[in-house]
Amino acid sequence: MGRLAIIVTFFALLGQSPTTFDLSTDFSLHDNPDKAWQFGYSETNSLASNQFRIDQHVDDLHPIGFWHPAVNNGPGPGYYPYVAFNSTQQTQYGSSNGWAARAGEVAMEASSAGQYSMVRFTAPVAGPYKVSARFAGIHFGLSTTDVHVMHNDSSLFDADIEGYGGDPAFHKVEGANPTAAYSGDINMKAGDTLTFAVGYGKNKTNFGDTTGLFAQVILIKNKQ
């Protein structure tokens, strides 16, 4: 086999190898959109794809930074819904020490008006993808939220979180449904979206609702 043929074969095989998009690894507190990921919220109390809005303000705090809809003065207008991230290698307390996020965990909370906190993935190319998501209540007051995984406007997964399912060194695991997980395979076109969303739950209040998320999307094989 000639050198050119070997090079062509190598890149063809490389293009067919799995590509992993890991939210914890890829998360940025500087760029939004961040490669294939966007951090945002719903304009209204709706999961419709056209309601997604990108967060415009970042509090690049340490150890946990926050994306917010707009510049704000703390809890109130512009603060909720938020998408936060623990960039360290160990569990850290969140705002007011009322919750804790594990290493690499994204923390999400809806607004009191029912706007969803959202993380969105946009497929860079067409192909089969493996999707996994793990949600957990991480507020010490026991989170009561609804969590979702959407493909464009179609629901892949819906569940309720009731309880605490985070780091047991910070609070005991308790509640009727402290965690929820999804795993599935899906074919996507380039530009298709996956949305991971957290709402304010059946009690329709976001008080004490911080919910953790780990998510991963793997492109199994590029369509040639």
Please place each PLM-identified region on the residue numbering.
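Sec-dependent N-terminal signal peptides
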Residues: 4-13
